[in-house]
Amino acid sequence: MYDYPLYRPPSESNSLIIQATLGCSHNKCSFCNMYKSKIFTIKSLEEIKKEIDYFRTIYKYVEKIFLADGDALIIPIGDLKSILEYIKNVFPECTRVTMYGSPKSILLKSIEELEELKKLGLYMIYMGIESGDDEVLLDINKGVSSKELIKATQKVKKSKITLSVTVIAGIGGKEKSINHAINTGKIISEIEPDYLGVLTLMLEKGTDLYNKILNKEFNVLNDKDILDEIKLLIENIDVSNHVIFRCNHASNYISLKGTFPIDKQRLLNEILYYQNTNNLKQEVFRRL
C-alpha cells in the first residue's frame, strides 16, 4: 500500500498515514535526500478514496490522520476538499487531519481556501522554515525568501489552522551561524507559530550540501557550536503569545522543551548546564 521511504512528524506516530502524494513538490533543498528516489506525484482522487476505504476495513477506530508525503497541501483545492470530506464520511471518529505544507503550496492558496480546509477537518500544517536568514535560505535552495516565509505563515495563522514550524541548527555552517541564529529568532518572533521544533543538521550522503562539505565549501559546526547557536536563537525569540518549543528530536545533541515566553530563561539556563557539564548525546546516537 505504501511507497517507501515514508516519513511523518514525530508527533504523528499514532496517526494513520494516507499517502495522497509521492515525494516533495520542491525536492531541491541542498541538505535533504528524503524524497530524492521519488518523482513527485499527486495521486488521483479515485486512488486516494480507494486507500481510505481500504484502511477503514482494517482499522476500527482512527482518531488522527496524516496526509503524506512531503507536501500534501500542494494538492489542488477542489481535490483536497474532496479528500477531507471523504475522510469525514469514512472515518467520522477522526478528530484531526494534518499534513506537511511547503511555503509555496501555502502561498498558492488563499486565506479563504485555507479556512475551508480548516472547516473540513484540517487541524495542523507542518512547515519547514529551516532558517530566517535570506543568505542561508538561498544557500540551501529553499526556494523562498524570509518575507515569503512570513507571508505564508501569516496566511495559516489567519485561517486558524494550527501551525508547527521547524528550524535547523547548523544549517548555515560556521561562517553564517550567528546570522542564522539571530535572524531565525527574529522570524519566529514575527510569526509566533503554535509550535516550534529545532532539529540539528544531519549530514546525508548524496545531497548537494554533503558534496560541499567534501569540497571544503561548508564548515560543519561541532556539538559545542550547535549549543551556542541554539542559545543565540532562543535569546532572539521575543513573543507575546504562547509558542510551544521542542528541541528533543533524535538529531539533537540535547533535549529541551518548554513554552515561550514563560520558559525562555529556564531554557537558557538548561543550555548553560549542558555547556558546563558537556553532557551531550554522542554522535553515534543522532539520527533523523
Regions found by a protein language model. Name each.
Residues 24, 32, 48, 67, ...:
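Conserved, mostly hydrophobic/aromatic
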Residues 112-114, 172-190:
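Catalytic cores of alpha/beta
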